[in-house]
């Protein structure tokens, strides 16, 4: 096949679309594709060579993507590589406009999508340009200031782009990336997220094994150990998981994951966030940062297989542990994740298996033999996931996920999966009362249909179920239950498509050598006829119940409801599928039945009639000759008979019989055209008779008939969709139909029967047009010219006939011709439309009716608009006709889209992902070929814009601005479609639209004005004329929009118009992307383009450009960049002009200011006139304008920032670093090392003089130096090399002078500050980053020039304790501190002399409204700053934050502010942290709750730096361990005493020292707050330290769920809940268990009780880590069993609950010894009760014997409760044992009763199944127990 292709083409294509080979006109395609490809290569190459990015390059890259859509990758490898390289160069042009970048990127992704086509030898792409692109866009420094506008989609596109280029990065890339990003890995900083994000995206994982040393081996150990040691799910952990999943999947068999597998599964289980235990608090961050299931699934499926089988064991454990969560009665927000896991995992395993066994080998590394999945592996996998999937079938989220999972599992192991589904399906079909069961099981059956019908050696008995299923599904065709009906239709259609319905029962006698199964199938196939007839009867019943008269009044609704139309669709498609698959004999019987039904009664034409007509159409479509013989003569004679009567033709209400026959006729003619030719005379007669009926319904049916006849004759389409090529045959000696059950279509043996219009048919079509269309056109023409006046109804009738004639025959009519519209755009590259051949050779000798209709319709439109503008129906019709004249060639785009979607849905529901290679059923393959034909038919890209189109579009525009809104609306939609089709027509149309908005014109009506605005707004999917991304377009539309505010037809009273302007402004702001002013193409692109122009096969056409042209191209490129600058400046000037017009309404002033703010860019400064305007607007009356101005001025200041010189230094040359590194060895460690100590804050070495300041090497960014040092560190050059500070006014440029003058003006400043200290929205205001940026910019660009003026204001504001003045001064101060980054020492010193008193004052005035603002202020001021530069600030904040002056509240606020500053500094201020801790420790016994909480939070931040990460040095910041020691010492009084700890302190500070115990309790409360806040924040939990506090917490935590407890107890409870969820390392487990063991011996039963709840959560959240440690499991088991015999009843019961939980998640198993242990306990003899004398004291203490007996009973009951949804083999016996204790003393009796009632509750649903597991005797006892009187007692 390939060979022939390459000989015809002249090259061997990379991968073309095979479906093209099956089209009826395939011979013409090779020449066509070669011609187009040559054009693309030639013109794309030239466009780049002539440096014409727009329109040339953009236009021809679009052509290339269309080419790929039509032909696939039909070019040779050499071209492929050149295309990729060229596009890579284009995407990475630094100044390229983002919208173009995206368009190139999408094409590049398509080119790289099939990575098997290009290997690493063929192609290598550098990684750095992509990194720079990503960095420039994602971490843009100017976007937040409004200097860059990026579209929201850009992030996703870049991600996919990098993913596609990743396999081709050079082998040195990994090391380079690590050097680049490793220094960013500082876990306390946002850069950690950045580094991990880049690692996840960029690190290549597909290197061949011999290069692994240069690939993942460089980073795997570091990153996996980091992942293993992080305990609290920071947001970057998700990136690691995705990276590991990809690594595992790309290198199966090359990495030993075994040591990590328990950890991996533990973390996966944790990230499902399942609820465990009774009272659970989830740490919120576990929810937000949970793993993405799609990565988890890839990771798991890559771990399966291999020699150790460990992953499968853990996976089974995982599913065993969570199976019960899938039960339909459970529901919660976690359910979606579980379902996703179920749905994706089988798909992922199937994908892997396909890669191992069926995929054609490619250059990618194959999986080594040792790690391939064996048959046993697959069976184990299916077994482990089967149970949850079967439970999930009936889930609350619907059965779709389960159905998809089953579809994939059935491919792997049909014999394991299908039988249980069948067991659920048969009963569901029998019951009538549970329809949801039926819908669920049927949708699952549809998924496994192919596996079932095909049978195969694994599941040979599969096909036997086919007939029983079909027969039992029939009752589902139920008129009363819509969803049941639809799923039944889908079910029947799916199964019947797979099977030819032929009766082969006689083959049993005539053929020998049939197997047993084949014999059974043959005899069963006798039922098929019965099935088809029954189905037809059911359909008739359905139709009878849904006639219009029965359901609603005739007048209300003529149309079908939405539901009915769905049923109609389901009915007709299922029926036609069944008939297609029938043998001729069965068909004949069905045909007679349908014919009788249709002709013996008369149906109304709206609901029932449509359904019946659909069924009749299905019969004629299947076998046209046989069916037409019955239907056509019948209908024709009936119609002629009735219509012979003259009056009938003029009746308003037609005879029902006539209507019905007409409807039936119009549907049955939808068959192959050649069959209709036999009846041509009758059909013509009927058409002539009925087309001019008076009744509208009548003539519309006649039009439909005409349309269907023409379409059948003129289109190309497949004649049949049967599942076997050549139609369904009877069995013969050599052929047995049952062997074709479930057979996929063979792509190269489809034998599609095409209908291609023959000459006769074409003749007949044109005969009909001459006969019927011509007279109507003449009639309309006369009407227009005023010769003959016709009524409106007649015009409408004529238009209807014209439209239907055109729709039917349009594929034979050539497109409209005309002169191209000149001078829209001048480029040097040709842009021409691609003509795609679609099987029709136009006959130019005939009349071109497309042109004729066009010539008649335009004058008619004119006439209608002038004389009868209210004839809306005719206008609607004309709009439709214009739309079709422009675009229609046989199919509509929206119909094509829905068909494409439904094709994909069906393909998904029936595909075989395991074998791949297009093994779809034949009908689907034919459908796909047909879609390919339609796709070619609809390809309209880049059409030339001709004068005809111009005229029609102008007509549409006229309609879009006409009087009636409905007409406008429809015309606008057609207009938008047209605008998207023709090249550059928008440029032609914009001026015309804008004329309506011209304020000079007085003749524009309000409707026209609105219409024009709507035309500019566009619809949601199409083009928005107001915002085309070109300077020439915006320069016209934006000023025009603003000026339209003065138009006489504009009124702000009309809400609809105001809303339109709002929508326009909103859309422009949403969609605007920065438009480039630089359109240059770099040399590197041109080189590749020249190579492409030299390539051969096919030769590029046209060839390379001459030198002359190249020079011209360069000149144009320069000119274009100049033009862009001028247009930009002109647009800004125009907008400013509009603003200076005094009459402009306020609304439009705001609109203009919005537009102006979009004009800020980072590569061109704003013209100074606009700068002046924005600075003046800072004091505008309107708040909205002031806010825009603040943002804009902040942006302008960024534009004016003079660049500070940076020098690249090797870090090891810095003097401070040299001195600290005596030894030359550079360690790999991160964290606090000798070589980064000089970066840290050290009060003895602070720069306190000019000389120190100059010598000190400041490093501003906090992350440098924590991890490894970068190769090159960028530092600021010394002060003398920086731009001059303190410029005089003369040295400034014009823009700077404007700002300088205003801010030096006392009045301006006073007014400005007054506005800033007003309240905007009461109680909603926050610290504003925009204002901060403004002040930062002022102080950065102008040093301290404005301080003298601002100083009095700041002093005044600080003294005012109201919220707004305080916020205003906070914004100024943070801007000041950050803006002073580069000031000289003397200025900085003066600044702090001013600021320190101000801040002290502010902090003493702090209030509940302002403390957050001050916190933000200080945090913002300290962000990314060297702490040594801010030492004044830190020293001031450290002055006794907790003084008690001003009350507890001020203390808490000061701490908050201080914490904000220190947290930003992370690891660089250990000294300050130590000082703070020392200062706080004595104060931990605070009385006030708010201060305690704040101290807790501060402690979290103090200890944040003490992390336990791999390769990290112990920190020099405070450490938790030492702190815990000191705290425990102070808590002694509490830990030693045995009595209950009560919180009996009244909250008031009494003088004099209280006793130690009270102090200890106060201390404990603060410690609790610290434990709570640190649970979710730090990276690693300090388990050993927390363990020492555990005994104390267990003592306090309350047992009952009671809210009335005091703060201390609830806090303790919360702490325990959070600690128990913590992730444990395997070495910490023994420590925890021994601590728990110790506490379990304590005398307080509260502690013993709480241990159990703690244990439940801890074990579940670390399930696999525990399971991998056998000793730990034994210890837990022993602990629980011991507490089961506790003397306290509550503890015993809790132990039983815990035990049943452990059994349920398979942590422990029910084995013989355990069962025996419980039985022997439960048989403990109780001492006889003595008869007590009356009045004697009842002994209440339970004897030890009773406790043991109860423990045994509890143990048995735990076993029973541990399997709530099924009955394991051991259960009946245990139930019998339990029942023996029903009459024991309390508390035993209660336990037994409760257990039995629970058992009854949980097993009630499926009792029929469960009953099977018991013997008859046991059942008797059980029934007796569950319903016996004692049950009610």
Swiss-Prot record:
Region feature (Bromodomain-like (BRDL)): 1640-1728
GO CC term, one of those recorded: cytosol
Disordered: region residues: 1095-1122
Pfam families: HEAT_PSME4, HEAT_PSME4_mid, PSME4_C
Keyword Chloroplast in annotation: no
HEAT repeat start and end residues: 460-504, 983-1022, 1164-1202, 1344-1382, 1626-1664, 1670-1708
Keyword tRNA processing (UniProt): no
UniProt keyword terms in alphabetical order: Cytoplasm, DNA damage, DNA repair, Nucleus, Proteasome, Repeat
Free-text function comment from the UniProt entry: Associated component of the proteasome that specifically recognizes acetylated histones and promotes ATP- and ubiquitin-independent degradation of core histones during DNA damage response. Recognizes and binds acetylated histones via its bromodomain-like (BRDL) region and activates the proteasome by opening the gated channel for substrate entry. Binds to the core proteasome via its C-terminus, which occupies the same binding sites as the proteasomal ATPases, opening the closed structure of the proteasome via an active gating mechanism.
Record-stated family: Belongs to the BLM10 family.
UniProt free text on domains: The bromodomain-like (BRDL) region specifically recognizes and binds acetylated histones.
Protein name (Swiss-Prot/TrEMBL): Proteasome activator complex subunit 4A
Name of the gene this protein is made from: psme4a
């Amino acid at each position: 096949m390939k060979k022939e292709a390459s000989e015809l083409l002249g090259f061997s294509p990379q991968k073309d679309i095979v479906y093209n080979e099956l089209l009826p006109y395939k011979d013409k395609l090779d020449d066509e594709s070669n011609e187009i490809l040559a054009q693309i290569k030639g013109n794309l190459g030239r466009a780049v060579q002539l440096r014409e990015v727009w329109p040339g390059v953009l236009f021809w890259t679009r052509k290339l993507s269309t080419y790929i859509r039509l032909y696939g990758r039909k070019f040779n490898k050499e071209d492929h590589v050149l295309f990729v390289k060229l596009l890579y160069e284009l995407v990475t042009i630094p100044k390229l406009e983002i919208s173009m970048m995206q368009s190139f990127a999408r094409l590049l992704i398509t080119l790289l999508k099939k990575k098997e086509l290009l290997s690493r030898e063929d192609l290598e792409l550098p990684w750095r340009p992509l990194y720079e692109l990503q960095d420039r866009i994602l971490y843009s420094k100017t976007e937040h200031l409004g200097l860059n506008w990026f579209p929201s989609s850009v992030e996703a596109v870049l991600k996919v782009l990098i993913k596609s280029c990743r396999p081709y990065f050079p082998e040195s890339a990994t090391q380079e990336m690590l050097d680049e990003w490793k220094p960013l890995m500082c876990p306390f900083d946002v850069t950690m997220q950045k580094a991990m994000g880049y690692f996840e995206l960029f690190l290549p994982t597909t290197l061949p094994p011999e290069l692994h040393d240069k690939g993942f081996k460089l980073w795997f150990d570091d990153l996996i150990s980091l992942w293993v040691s992080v305990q609290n799910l920071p947001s970057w952990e998700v990136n690691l998981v995705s990276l590991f999943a990809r690594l595992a999947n790309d290198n199966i068999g090359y990495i030993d994951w075994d040591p990590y597998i328990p950890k991996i599964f533990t973390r996966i289980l944790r990230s499902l966030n399942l609820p465990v235990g009774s009272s659970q608090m989830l740490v919120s961050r576990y929810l937000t940062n949970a793993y993405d299931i799609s990565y988890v699934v890839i990771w798991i499926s890559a771990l399966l297989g291999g020699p150790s089988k460990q992953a499968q064991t853990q996976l089974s454990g995982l599913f065993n542990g969570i199976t019960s969560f899938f039960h339909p009665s459970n529901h919660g927000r976690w359910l979606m994740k579980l379902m996703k896991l179920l749905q994706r995992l089988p798909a992922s395993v199937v994908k892997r298996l396909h890669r191992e066994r069926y995929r054609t080998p490619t250059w990618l590394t194959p999986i080594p033999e040792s790690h391939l999945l064996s048959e046993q592996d697959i069976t184990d996998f299916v077994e482990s996931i089967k149970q949850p999937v079967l439970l999930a079938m009936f889930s609350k989220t619907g059965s779709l996920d389960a159905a998809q999972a089953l579809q994939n599992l059935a491919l792997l192991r049909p014999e394991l999966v299908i039988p249980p589904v069948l067991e659920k399906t048969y009963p569901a079909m029998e019951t009538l009362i549970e329809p949801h069961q039926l819908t669920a099981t049927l949708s699952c059956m549809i998924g496994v249909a192919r596996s079932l019908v095909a049978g195969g050696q694994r599941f040979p008995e599969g096909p036997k179920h086919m007939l029983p299923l079909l027969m039992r599904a029939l009752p589902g065709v139920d008129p009363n239950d819509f969803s049941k009906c639809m799923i039944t239709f889908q079910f029947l259609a799916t199964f019947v498509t797979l099977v030819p319905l032929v009766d082969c029962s006689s083959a049993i006698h005539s053929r020998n050598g049939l197997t047993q199964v084949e014999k059974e199938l043959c005899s069963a196939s006798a039922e098929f006829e019965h099935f088809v007839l029954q189905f037809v009867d059911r359909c008739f019943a359905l139709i009878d119940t849904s006639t219009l008269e029965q359901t609603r009044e005739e007048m209300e609704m003529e149309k079908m409801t939405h539901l009915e139309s769905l049923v109609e669709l389901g009915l007709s498609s299922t029926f036609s599928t069944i008939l297609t698959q029938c043998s001729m004999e069965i068909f004949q019987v069905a045909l007679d039945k349908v014919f009788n039904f249709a002709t013996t009664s008369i149906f109304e034409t709206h609901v029932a009639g449509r359904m019946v007509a659909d069924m009749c159409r299905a019969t004629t479509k299947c076998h046209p000759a046989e069916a037409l013989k019955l239907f056509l003569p019948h209908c024709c004679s009936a119609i002629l008979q009735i219509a012979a009567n003259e009056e009938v033709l003029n009746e308003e209400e037609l005879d029902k019989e006539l209507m019905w026959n007409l409807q039936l006729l119009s549907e049955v003619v939808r068959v192959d055209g050649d069959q209709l030719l036999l009846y041509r005379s009758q059909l013509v007669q009927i058409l002539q008779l009925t087309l001019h009926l008076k009744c509208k319904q009548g003539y519309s049916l006649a039009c439909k008939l005409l349309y269907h006849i023409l379409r059948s004759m003129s289109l190309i389409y497949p004649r049949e969709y049967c599942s076997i090529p050549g139609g369904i045959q009877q069995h013969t000696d050599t052929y047995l139909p049952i062997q074709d059950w479930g057979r996929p279509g063979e792509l190269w043996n489809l034998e599609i029967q095409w209908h291609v219009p023959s000459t006769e048919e074409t003749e007949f079509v044109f005969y009909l047009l001459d006969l019927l269309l011509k007279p109507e056109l003449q009639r309309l023409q006369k009407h227009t010219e005023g010769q003959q006046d016709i009524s409106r109804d007649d015009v409408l009738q004529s238009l209807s006939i014209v439209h239907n004639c055109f729709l039917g025959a349009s594929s034979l009519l050539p497109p409209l011709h005309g002169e191209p519209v000149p001078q829209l755009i001048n480029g040097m590259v040709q842009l021409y439309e691609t003509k795609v051949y679609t099987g029709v050779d136009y006959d130019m000798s005939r009349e071109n009716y497309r042109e004729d209709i066009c010539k008649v319709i335009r004058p008619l439109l004119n006439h209608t608009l002038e004389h009868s503008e209210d004839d809306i129906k005719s206008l609607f019709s004309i709009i439709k006709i214009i739309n079709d004249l422009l675009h229609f060639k046989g199919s509509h785009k929206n119909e094509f889209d829905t068909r494409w979607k439904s094709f994909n849905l069906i393909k998904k529901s029936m595909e075989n992902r395991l074998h791949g290679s297009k093994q779809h059923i034949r009908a689907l393959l034919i459908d796909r070929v047909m879609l390919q034909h339609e796709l070619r038919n609809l390809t309209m890209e880049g059409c030339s814009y001709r004068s005809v189109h111009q005229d029609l579009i102008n007509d549409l525009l006229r309609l879009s601005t006409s009087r009636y809104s409905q007409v406008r609306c429809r015309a606008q939609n057609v207009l938008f479609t047209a605008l998207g089709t023709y090249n550059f027509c928008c440029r032609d149309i914009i001026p015309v639209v804008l004329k309506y908005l011209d304020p000079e014109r007085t003749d524009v009506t309000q409707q026209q004005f609105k219409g024009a605005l709507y035309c500019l707004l566009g619809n949601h999917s199409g083009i928005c004329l107001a915002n085309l991304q070109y300077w020439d377009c915006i320069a016209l539309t934006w000023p025009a929009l603003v000026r339209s505010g003065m138009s006489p037809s504009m009124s702000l009273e009309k809400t609809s118009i105001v809303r339109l302007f709002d929508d326009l402004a909103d859309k422009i702001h949403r969609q605007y992307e920065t438009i480039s002013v630089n359109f240059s193409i770099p040399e590197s692109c041109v080189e590749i383009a020249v190579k492409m122009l030299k390539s051969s096969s096919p030769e590029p056409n046209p060839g390379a450009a001459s030198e002359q042209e190249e020079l011209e191209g360069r000149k144009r490129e320069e000119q274009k960049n100049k033009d862009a600058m001028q247009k930009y400046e002109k647009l800004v000037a125009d907008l400013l002009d509009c603003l200076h017009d005094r009459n402009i309404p306020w609304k439009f002033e705001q609109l203009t200011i919005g537009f102006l703010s979009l004009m800020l860019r980072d590569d061109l400064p704003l013209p100074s006139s606009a700068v002046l305007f924005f600075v003046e607007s800072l004091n505008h009356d309107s708040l909205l304008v002031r806010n825009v101005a603040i943002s804009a001025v902040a942006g302008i200041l960024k534009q004016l920032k003079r660049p500070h010189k940076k020098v690249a230094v090797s870090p090891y040359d810095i003097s401070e670093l040299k001195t600290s590194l005596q030894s030359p060895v550079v360690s790999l460690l991160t964290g606090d090392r000798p070589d980064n100590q000089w970066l840290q804050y050290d009060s003895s070495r602070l720069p306190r003089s000019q000389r120190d300041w100059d010598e000190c090497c400041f490093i501003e960014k906090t992350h440098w130096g924590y991890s490894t040092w970068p190769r090159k560190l960028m530092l600021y050059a010394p002060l003398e090399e920086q731009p001059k500070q303190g410029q005089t006014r003369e040295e400034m440029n014009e823009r700077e002078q404007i700002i300088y003058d205003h801010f030096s003006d006392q009045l301006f400043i006073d007014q400005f500050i007054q506005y800033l200290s007003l309240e905007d929205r009461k109680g909603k205001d926050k610290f504003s980053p925009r204002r901060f940026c403004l002040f930062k910019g002022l102080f950065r660009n102008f040093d301290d020039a404005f301080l003298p003026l601002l100083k009095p204001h700041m002093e005044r504001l600080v003294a005012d304790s109201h919220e707004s003045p305080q916020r205003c001064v906070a914004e100024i101060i943070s801007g000041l501190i950050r803006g002073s980054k580069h000031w000289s020492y003397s200025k900085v010193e003066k600044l702090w002399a001013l600021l320190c008193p101000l801040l002290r004052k502010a902090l003493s005035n702090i209030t509940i409204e302002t403390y957050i603002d001050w916190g933000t202020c200080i945090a913002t001021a300290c962000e990314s700053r060297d702490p040594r530069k801010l030492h004044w600030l830190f020293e001031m904040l450290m002055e006794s934050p907790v003084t008690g002056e001003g009350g507890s509240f001020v203390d808490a606020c000061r701490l908050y502010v201080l914490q904000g500053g220190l947290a930003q500094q992370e690891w660089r201020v250990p000294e300050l942290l130590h000082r703070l801790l020392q200062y706080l420790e004595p104060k931990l016994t605070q009385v006030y709750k708010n201060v305690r909480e704040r101290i807790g939070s501060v402690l979290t931040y103090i200890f944040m730096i003490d992390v336990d990460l791999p390769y990290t040095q112990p920190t020099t910041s405070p450490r938790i361990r030492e702190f815990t020691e000191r705290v425990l010492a102070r808590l002694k009084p509490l830990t030693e005493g045995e009595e209950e700890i009560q919180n009996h302190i009244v909250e008031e500070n009494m003088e004099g020292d209280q006793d130690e115990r009270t102090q200890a309790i106060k201390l404990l409360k603060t410690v609790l707050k610290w434990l709570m806040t640190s649970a979710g924040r730090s990276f690693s939990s300090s388990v050993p330290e927390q363990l020492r506090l555990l005994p104390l917490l267990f003592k306090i935590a309350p047992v009952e769920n009671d809210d009335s407890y005091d703060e201390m107890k609830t806090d303790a409870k919360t702490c325990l809940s959070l600690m128990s969820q913590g992730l444990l390392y395997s070495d910490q487990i023994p420590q925890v268990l021994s601590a728990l063991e110790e506490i379990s011996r304590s005398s307080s039963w509260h502690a013993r009780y709480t241990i159990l709840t703690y244990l439940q959560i801890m074990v579940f959240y670390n399930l696999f880590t525990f399971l991998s440690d056998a000793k730990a499991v034994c210890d837990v088991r022993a602990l629980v069993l011991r507490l089961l015999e506790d003397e306290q009843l509550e503890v015993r019961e809790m132990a039983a609950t815990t035990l049943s939980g452990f059994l349920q998640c398979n942590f422990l198993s029910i084995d013989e010894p355990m069962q025996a242990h419980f039985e022997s306990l439960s048989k403990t003899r109780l001492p006889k009760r003595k008869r007590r004398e009356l009045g004697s004291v009842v002994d209440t203490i339970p004897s030890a014997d009773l406790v043991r007996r109860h423990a045994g009973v509890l143990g048995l009951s735990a076993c029973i409760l541990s399997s709530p949804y099924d009955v394991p083999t051991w259960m009946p016996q245990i139930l019998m044992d339990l029942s023996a204790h029903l009459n024991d003393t309390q508390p035993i009796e209660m336990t037994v009763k409760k257990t039995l009632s629970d058992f009854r509750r949980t097993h009630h649903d499926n009792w029929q199944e469960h009953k099977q597991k018991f013997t008859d005797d046991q059942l008797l006892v059980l029934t007796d127990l569950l319903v016996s009187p004692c049950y009610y007692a």
